[in-house]
């Protein structure tokens, strides 16, 4: 997040994560409060230099993709997004696995409804679902925002799609990525 140290400390204490993924900027903030979170595993992304006690994300990727076989209660928390905190400290909004799954289904239904409505209004034949290509989404919003996760990452992952991440918004870079990656879906802030 874009939190300053005291906000970061509050969010970490409130959510009790096991692993913290952070880039250079957030890592620098975290290192000032790290002693309060001694058991927190820290993974660095886009780091300029290695840091003691911080695992580089490239090393994580080398370990392979095997995940443990676990049982998930659909009503357990899947993620926590924090509000902006306009009336005090940010509040953790918890999303369940069931809620995230329903969101994916609702987005799929809404997308198909919009497509079929557009085809009908324009006297076009709907495309054959067998010809559908996986989503290729350009993510221009921060991953700590619900829009990037629920509206892009979840449906793209569920459909076998591709996410192309922009670290910071740059219109020229976005155009290059759209062309090079053949982006089919873009969501951004007006």
Model-assigned labels for residue ranges:
Residues 78-118:
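Conserved AMP-binding A3 loop
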Residues 25-77, 89, 101:
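ANL superfamily adenylate-forming
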Residues 15-16, 37, 180-181:
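Active-site charged/polar residues at nucleotide-handling catalytic sites that mediate phosphoryl
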Residues 22-31, 46-50, 141, 167-172, ...:
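Adenylate-forming
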Residues 9, 69, 172-175:
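Short hydrophobic/charged patches on amphipathic alpha-helices used for structural packing
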Residues 64-82, 89, 119, 126-136:
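Conserved pre-ATP/AMP-binding loop-to-beta segment of ANL
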Residues 101-140, 144-185:
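Conserved AMP-binding/adenylation subdomain of ANL enzymes
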């Amino acid at each position: 997040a874009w939190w300053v140290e005291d906000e970061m400390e509050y969010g970490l204490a409130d959510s009790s994560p096991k692993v913290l993924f952070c880039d250079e900027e957030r890592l620098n903030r975290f290192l000032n409060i790290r002693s309060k979170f001694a058991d927190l595993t820290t993974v660095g992304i886009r780091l300029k230099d290695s840091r003691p006690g911080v695992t580089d994300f490239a090393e994580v990727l080398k370990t392979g993709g095997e995940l443990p076989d676990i049982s998930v209660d659909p009503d357990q928390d899947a993620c926590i997004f924090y509000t902006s905190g306009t009336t005090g400290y940010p509040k953790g909004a918890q999303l369940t696995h069931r809620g995230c799954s329903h969101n994916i289904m609702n987005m799929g239904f809404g997308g198909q409804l919009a497509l079929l409505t557009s085809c009908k209004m324009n006297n076009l034949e709907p495309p054959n679902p067998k010809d559908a290509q996986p989503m290729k989404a350009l993510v221009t919003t921060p991953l700590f925002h619900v829009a990037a996760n629920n509206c892009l990452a979840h449906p793209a992952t569920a459909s076998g799609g591709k996410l192309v991440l922009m670290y910071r918004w740059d219109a020229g870079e976005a155009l290059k990525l759209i062309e090079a990656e053949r982006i089919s879906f873009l969501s951004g802030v007006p």
